[in-house]
Amino acid sequence: MQHSDGRVELRPEAAEAIRRSPLYNKDLAPVPVERRNWTTYNYAALWISMAHCIPTYMLSSGLISAGMNWWQALITILLGNTIVLIPILLNSHPGTKYGIPFPVFARAAYGTYGSNLPALMRAIVACGWFGIQAWIGGEALDTFLAAIIPGWTILLGGPIGGHMVTEWLSFLLFWGLNIYIIYRGMDLLRKVENWAAPFVLIMTALLLGWAIWKAHGLGYLLTQQSNFHSFREFWPIFIISLTGMIGFWATLSLNMPDFTRFGHSQREQAIGQVVALPTTMTLFAAMSVVITSAALVIYPHMKMDELWDPIKLVGQFHNVAVIAISMFTVVVATLAVNIAANVVSPANDFANAFPKWISFRTGGLITGVVGILMQPWRLLADPSGYIFAWLVGYSGGLGSIAGVLIADYWFVRNKRLELGDLYRTKGSYTYSSGWNWRAVLATLIGCTLAWIGLVVPLLRPLYDYAWFVGFGAAAITYLLLMKIAPPQSPEALENRHGKSRVVGEAFYAPGSDSDKAKVVEQIS
């Protein structure tokens, strides 16, 4: 049933019928139109809260440590976020139109069971990010407690595994706080985002003012020199850094339907994202560039691998109130972004893989456990590895998935989906036993080309362009395969075997009384 504004929902009898499908659970169900109430402000606040986080801060400070000056770093970040905004908006559209999350949307291209491939690939990356953010939040909580509790650092003894026992305890406490909010649900998340976003911006601005005051102005920043003296020297570091910037939000470029399915309109969700993402990312990055550069003047004894981490930087302050307030801000910001960006999608992904056994809450708990097992304290050990290994590395795989999804929805299907069939084991998206081999093959080709540079030195430039290579190769391959070997329609298969087919958007379990809905006709 399509509304005048273009949004689609199931009729009541069809919505009731899909509940009997093994592909259904309440967390994956299409959101009714009356519950799609997120406005422009909600999406702007979502991006502001996600952008104002320590990993964003580390992006710009990491580029500075790589040799860029302030304007080179900011241009790289602005361009990267502008580019990644394109697939984000393209994949946001089906969420708002059909009210479906990312794993269900992926069924259209990959098949009802094949969608587990992109969903679980995305989930693994998100688990890694969850662990990283939880470790950062734990560091902030540890610094906060050390500021207000005398002797906190040595309270429980010496270091274990390279970190103090209180650091491990703070990490587990922050991890538990994330799990608590997951079990409270999405409504609590929206409330946290609405007040956390402006609060974090104000506190960061205060820290910026302090840095400029202590460094006696911005003269140091304007005279900062780049380590690259020609375009030829700058280009290699620029392109891999740009790929890393795109990789930073490549996860959200896939699973944005998890949020836009609550959108009140296409216009509101699009405006909220266009206004908030590139501007807030660049603004926050600019703040971190100024603060980090000022810190070089204020604390000349500190190394760059310490200055790039604002938690370690604030730990140098002698004012207990400043440390406590700053770290409280970091804890709130990290909590908001971690749940929004790194829990919603993998929780839905795990629920999609096993819909009858795993709910959103259970999927969130799995995300938290896997995040610990990925050892985030090791992922953050090296600032250059954070950008050039972690971000660039996974961008090739996620870019390949984005290429397939966008090619399928916008070019193969022209934005038209059979909503009910996304929840049917036998329908338009069944393909071969629930798998569309064309999408799987296209994804594998994209990933192979994006990552082959890691093992073949001669092809290293392909890895530097990992997201672009994966996206382009997968999209082109998928379009060619769908043209050369198009899947057979379910109607043709049913005509061949003389079976019943379903007309309209509904699912009928074996043995159900389909005559009641008057939507099944016999094909002989």
Locate the predicted segments by residue:
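Juxtamembrane transmembrane-helix boundary signature
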Residues: 77-110, 122-125, 129-135, 291-295, ...
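Membrane-interface loop-to-helix entry segments
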Residues: 121, 132, 138, 169-213, ...
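Selective recognition of specific alpha-helical transmembrane segments in multi-pass small-molecule
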Residues: 52-56, 79-87, 121-133, 198-214, ...
